[in-house]
Amino acid sequence: PAAGATQIEPATHSDAQELGLDTTLLRKDSNLVGTLRIAAINNIASSVLMQMFASFNQAYPLIDLHIKVSNSDLSLSQREDDIAIRLTNSPTDKLIGKSMVTVASAIYGGRSYLERVAERGEEPKWIGVDCCNFHKSWTKQHCEEHTHHFNSDDTLLTLSAIREGLGISFLPCFMGDADPVLKRYSDPDPKHDLGLWVLFHADLRRTARVLAVREHISK
């Protein structure tokens, strides 16, 4: 399949009525100035979200975006950040929000590495991951007894390790399909789909800057 063809699909549901109400409030609230702190995971923030950040900056020049790379919702629940953008199917019940799109994942390896192990009749090595609970769980399910000779706690680091022939690992398809050095070792399985959630604290649901981001992402 073409690069990125299966990686992100529109969500099948929407909160159109709620969003319409929020948009009305947004038009009445002129306080679209100040700082907006967004916590987002590294691989999403530096790739697919960057275009959205750039267009938001142009649409709302008086709002200063502060993007923090983080995989934890703790900073949001403690009010250190205004919005968190997460890949998950089970967002914490302390926060509210909605899933915007579905992100597929597959197992990837370097093209030359996979060719080499196939010629030798060997099984590819698995890269140990500790970047998030779902990637860690999926890896364990596929190679529970496997000894990992390389371990990573960051998806971008895992991507680099795959490129260097250190083994195979799960990656979001928007990352793996876009890299010509990589090849799918397996096709995406729907059970590994994750939602891209925009989360915020309940007290901030009517804040003008938060509403502006929600409306902008929903376009």
Which residues fall in each region the model found?
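Alpha-helical "hinge/linker" immediately C-terminal to small N-terminal DNA-binding modules
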Residues: P1-R27
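Short loop or secondary-structure boundary microenvironments that flank
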Residues: A11, N42, M175, F200-D203
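All-alpha effector-binding/dimerization core of bacterial HTH-type transcriptional repressors
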Residues: N31, S47-M52, A104, E119-E123
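Central regulatory/effector-binding core of bacterial HTH transcription factors
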Residues: V33-T92
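Short, well-ordered beta-strand segments
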Residues: R37-A39, A84, I127, S169, ...
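C-terminal regulatory
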Residues: Q78, S90-W197
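A late-sequence structural motif
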Residues: P188-K219
